[in-house]
Amino acid sequence: MSRVGIVIASHSDLLARGVAELAGQMAPGVAIGAAGGLEDGGLGTSYDRIEEALEAVLAAVDGPGSGAVVLTDLGSATMTAESVVEMSEAPERIRLVDTALVEGAVAAAV
């Protein structure tokens, strides 16, 4: 089990799941959550989806210094993720990372 997991927050469910799948194939032992799109299937970012993915990833990692990094595709996804972190019960375990989404996800996973 890894000490750090990854959440991919995107405006598109397909994009989030695709990036998570790619990173997961390259690092199968890493907890990776995908939070993309809106509940109705449309484009956008969902506070609830990001929160659920983050909670699942945090529950899957353990040990001293364990936590999660959140990678986003666009500015409003970053703002939504920032809100989730601010309201989190353990914000000290979460880091938002400003990087290219695909490359950053793969680098974080491996």
Residue spans of the language-model regions?
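N-terminal loops that bind phosphate or other acidic moieties
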Residues: 1-110
